[in-house]
């Protein structure tokens, strides 16, 4: 078996270490309405189309109960759209600062391309958001061969449509000749639903939720415990393999090509 393409997520996988761009914005739009949500809650739906992310937050039992306490009723679809419009406005203003490629990504991409492997990408950001992120990332040396956003297909993650569109545009089939790499549970589900080899990256991920400084300064035992929690979460949601950093990806690829991993 030969791997012919790798499909990467963006924030938390290839750019924006820790996936912090959307986090505080999600928290802020709820806080403005007197409903406090935690960073852990805000991260849980990460990877979804952002309006679906807002909707998923309103459906969490604790948040829904707090909203009902404040407003006397559960959030409506109008509330969701109002918050999403605010989310977009704030996010657009900060996105250029959160498009820096994560350490090691550019080198791994270059190595994959030397092997003739095509580079695709999917995201939970809209096309308009990605015009900002992709442009800034390209200026800093990261540009995949193709990008698909939820706007380009009938639905975003966990549906497989963005991966399928990448496969068509890159001219690669069958799907088990491709790897999906991401940093969220929804990435794992997207890859598995598409019939692809699916790999979760841990350091810099939304699931780990730490800055690079926090990772580097944390007690090694505590950090290892957190890494293993994320590793298990990825495995429970379909990851065929996990890597701590992108530099380990080619090693996983070699195991796949030697048929030392089994797709199921």
Curated annotation (Swiss-Prot):
Superkingdom, taxonomy of origin: Bacteria
GO biological process, one term: DNA repair
Cofactor(s) needed by this chain: Mg(2+)
Enzyme class: hydrolase
Cofactor note text: Binds 1 Mg(2+) ion per subunit.
Active site residues of this protein: 9 (nucleophile), 50 (schiff-base intermediate with substrate)
Keyword tags: Hydrolase, Magnesium, Metal-binding, Schiff base
EC number assigned by the record: 3.11.1.1
Catalytic activity: phosphonoacetaldehyde + H2O = acetaldehyde + phosphate + H(+)
Molecular-function GO terms, alphabetical: magnesium ion binding; phosphoglycolate phosphatase activity; phosphonoacetaldehyde hydrolase activity
GO cellular component term of the entry, any: cytosol
Binding site for Mg(2+): 9, 11, 183
Pfam families, per database record: Hydrolase
Keyword Chloroplast: no
Subunit structure: Homodimer.
Family: Belongs to the HAD-like hydrolase superfamily. PhnX family.
Role of this protein: Involved in phosphonate degradation.
NCBIfam families, alphabetized: HAD-SF-IA-v1, HAD-SF-IA-v3, phosphonatase
Protein name stated in the entry: Phosphonoacetaldehyde hydrolase
Source organism (scientific name): Bacillus cereus (strain ATCC 14579 / DSM 31 / CCUG 7414 / JCM 2152 / NBRC 15305 / NCIMB 9373 / NCTC 2599 / NRRL B-3711)
Native organism taxonomy: Bacteria, Bacillati, Bacillota, Bacilli, Bacillales
């Amino acid at each position: 078996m030969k791997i012919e393409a790798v499909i990467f997520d963006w924030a938390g996988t290839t750019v924006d270490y820790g996936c912090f761009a959307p986090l505080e914005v999600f928290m802020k739009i709820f806080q403005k309405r007197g409903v406090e949500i935690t960073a852990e809650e805000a991260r849980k739906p990460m990877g979804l189309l952002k309006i679906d992310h807002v909707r998923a937050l309103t459906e969490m039992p604790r948040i829904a109960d707090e909203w009902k306490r404040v407003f006397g009723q559960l959030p409506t679809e109008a509330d969701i759209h109002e918050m999403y419009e605010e989310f977009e406005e704030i996010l657009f203003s900060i996105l250029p600062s959160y498009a820096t490629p994560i350490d090691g990504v550019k080198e791994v991409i270059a190595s994959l391309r030397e092997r003739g492997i095509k580079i695709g990408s999917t995201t939970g950001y809209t096309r308009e958001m990605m015009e900002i992120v992709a442009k800034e990332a390209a200026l800093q040396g990261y540009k995949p061969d193709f990008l698909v956003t939820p706007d380009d297909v009938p639905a975003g993650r966990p549906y497989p449509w963005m991966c399928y569109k990448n496969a068509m545009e890159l001219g690669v089939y069958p799907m088990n000749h491709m790897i999906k790499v991401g940093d969220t549970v929804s990435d794992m589900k997207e890859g598995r639903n598409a019939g692809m080899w699916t790999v979760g990256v841990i350091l810099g991920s939304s699931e780990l939720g730490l800055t690079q400084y926090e990772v580097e300064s944390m007690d090694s035992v505590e950090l290892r415990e957190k890494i293993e929690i994320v590793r298990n979460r990825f495995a429970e949601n379909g990851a065929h393999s996990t890597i701590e950093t992108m530099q380990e990806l080619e090693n996983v690829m070699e195991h796949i090509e030697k048929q030392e991993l089994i797709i199921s």
